[in-house]
Amino acid sequence: CYINEGRTGESVIREAMLKARNRDARPDEIEQIYAEKSAYFHQLGETYPIPNVADVLQHVQSCGHQIWVVTGSGQRTLIDSLHAVFPNIFQRDRMITAFDVTHGKPDPEPYLKAWERSGLPKEKCFVIENAPLGIRSGKAAGLTVYAVNTGILTREDLAQADQVFDSMTELLMFLKQ
């Protein structure tokens, strides 16, 4: 499930249609499938944050760093839940979503947009990722990428990152050094 994480919903739907029906998806099909997917995710109920991610975010924020969300998702419920679960951490003007890019991950565009909008030099920025496509995107943008294994992937799946951590706690200990 993490293999396509980070891609825009449209690109996943187009690829699936090519594989299943040997043709591109029409705009109405993309809209319908995406709406059905969003409704399904909404039915799953409450989502829970990755263990100890709040500690990482609070540490990064307390160090004075900007925190950006770079996601291939266009689901407004996801963005709203980020604000509900992590109040005062995320700012809407520091989010790059599927609505902001032409090319999703693994293309560098999402991370390049966040970097450009941050106004910071690249050496002052880093990416925290949990999926291979996001790692590739961050690296292609010329950024340092830290990967945290949050699911079923192997360390090898995340090996393109500059450093791989087995948990948010491990990442937090590294960041505090």
Question: Where are the model-predicted features located?
Answer:
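Hydrophobic/aromatic residues within well-ordered alpha-helical segments
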Residues: 4-9, 33-37, 74
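Structured helix-beta-strand junction loops
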Residues: 63-64, 160
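Alpha-helical substrate-recognition element adjacent to the catalytic core
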Residues: 1-21
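Conserved donor sugar-nucleotide recognition element shared by glycan-biosynthetic enzymes
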Residues: 9, 49, 107
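Metal-dependent phosphoesterase signature
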Residues: 17-55, 63
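Asp-based, Mg2+/Mn2+-dependent phosphohydrolase catalytic module
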Residues: 54, 58, 74-177
